[in-house]
Each structure stands twice: as C-alpha cells, then as structure tokens.
Amino acid sequence: MTKHLPTISDISPLLKAEILAEALPYIRAYHGKTIVIKYGGNAMVEERLKESFARDVILLKLVGMNPVVVHGGGPQIDEALKKIGKTGTFIQGMRVTDEETMEVVEWVLGGEVQQDIVMLINHFGGQAVGLTGKDGGLIHAKKMMIPSDAEPGKKIDIGFVGEIEAINPAVVKALQDDAFIPVISPIGFSAEGQAYNINADLVAGKMAEILHAEKLVMMTNIPGVMDKDGKLLTDLTAREIDALFADGTISGGMLPKISSALDAAKSGVNSVHIIDGRIEHSLLLEILTEQAFGTMIRSR
C-alpha cells in the first residue's frame, strides 16, 4: 500500500498562518544569503511537485534570499536512452557515459530539462536563466577515473564522466545581482572544449562551497539518510558517515550525494540538508520553519 504523502491542502488555514509567522526570523536570518538547491527525483517529474518547487524558489527570491538551482535529470536521461535502444549503466553511483550517451546527456540536461525548469519558474513570476558549464566558463572539468573496488590501486574508465577542476562563479553572481535565479545543468567542459557529464550532487556541493552558501539543500526520493532498519537518521557527523560507508548502509547513488554533502559541510557551508522532495513545499518547510526535516550533515 502506498503511503500518503502530505500536500498543502492537508494543512488547515490556521496552521498555514502559524507557518507564515514562524518564517519571519528565518527570512531575516537568510536575507541576502545564497541557498544552493540540488533539484532532482520525483520533484522533477510530478507536475504538482514541479509547480510547488517553482513557487518555493520564487518565494525565496522575493523575500531576499539568493537561490541557485542545480538540477539532475536521471529519469529523463534513462527515458531518452531507452528510445534509442540503450540502457544506463552505473558504477559507484556514476553513470557510465560513452560518446552517444554524452550527446543524449547534453541534449536532455542542457535542453529539455533545463528549459522546463526555467519556463516553469518564469511562468509563475520569477526570472530564471539557464546555464551549463560552458557559459561564462562556469564549470571547468577533466576526465574522471574511479578507483576499482575489486582491484585496489586500479582505476576504472567510465567514459565522458568529469570531475570538477574549478568553478568560475562570476556569471552566477552577476545573475544574482540582477535579481535572476540561476538554473545550472551539471555539464562541465575541458580546456579543449570536451563536454563531460558530472554528477549533479557534486556540482551542487562544489557550487555551495565556491559561492559561500548559507545552506545546501538536496532534494531526493526518500525522507533522508536511512539506517539498515529503514529508520531516518536526522543528524550525521563525518565519523558516523564513514561508518555508514564502511558497512554498506550508504551505497549506490547515495555515495556521491553524501560525499558531496559532507565536503560542503567541511568547506564551511553552514547548513547541509538532505530532504524528501516528494513532499509538497518541502523546500520552504526546510528553510523557513523550525520543523526538523530530513537529514542534517555536519563536519563534526
């Protein structure tokens, strides 16, 4: 039986008013601060959640915060690959990306998905601008080789998958200063102009670090980080995360997500959260209320 996930219609008018009143100190505290949001999962697929997300981002901008959206698009890439008879393959949470897959990734992320997000934000009254790593030299990347689990010391070539060498935040800051909302596709480029597919969690974490963000919020399809019994872990330190890596509790697609979140926390991002994007207005609930939500990642 599918568990009912709350929507805004489940909340009484009185509670809505209380939430607005509760938001005031957070609006003051985060005014002028940068909030980096990794947008992915069901929140990018279901129309109700897509509209909820767009409205949330616009509201954050209207009350004086500087939201920066870094989006994924795994399901959309898988669907596009399926149409040309290809199946996605992942190693350690990273998509193996041959030349044909890279062309699909560029088209889906930098085109279809990004345009959908930008158009939706603009439709509801915001001013969003889409970016890829090529725009303004935003994301400089090089080929990633990942360590083999089976053969220590050996590196695995997973194709046109990149790791971030540097981020030039000038174009993002310029857009923020002009009241725009940057929407960033996780595609990096080498000095030779080669495009690389970069995990969106890694881009979001590095962007939060470089922009000296107050918060990094990662939206997922689960309530947060779960233990082996399915219980939500609401607060994790670096030492606890290392233990979860070692015993296999954190694996697959969660590996780059948690690693990126922890790196951001260590770099000085004040608050790093992994939240359930399936809940309507989860972004506002995380940023503007006292409600403990999802998993907080701390460096110590």
From Swiss-Prot:
Belongs to the acetylglutamate kinase family. ArgB subfamily. GO terms for cellular component: cytoplasm. It comes from Polynucleobacter asymbioticus (strain DSM 18221 / CIP 109841 / QLW-P1DMWA-1). Catalyzes the ATP-dependent phosphorylation of N-acetyl-L-glutamate. It holds the Pfam family AA_kinase. SUPFAM superfamilies: Carbamate kinase-like. Its EC number is 2.7.2.8. Gene3D superfamilies: Acetylglutamate kinase-like. It catalyses: N-acetyl-L-glutamate + ATP = N-acetyl-L-glutamyl 5-phosphate + ADP. GO terms for molecular function: acetylglutamate kinase activity; ATP binding. Pathway: Amino-acid biosynthesis; L-arginine biosynthesis; N(2)-acetyl-L-ornithine from L-glutamate: step 2/4. The keyword Cytoplasm applies. NCBIfam families: argB (TIGR00761). The lineage of its organism: Bacteria, Pseudomonadati, Pseudomonadota, Betaproteobacteria, Burkholderiales. GO terms for biological process: arginine biosynthetic process via ornithine; L-arginine biosynthetic process. The record marks 38, 257 as: Transition state stabilizer. Keywords: Amino-acid biosynthesis, Arginine biosynthesis, ATP-binding, Cytoplasm, Kinase, Nucleotide-binding, Transferase. It is an enzyme of class 2 (transferase). This is Acetylglutamate kinase.
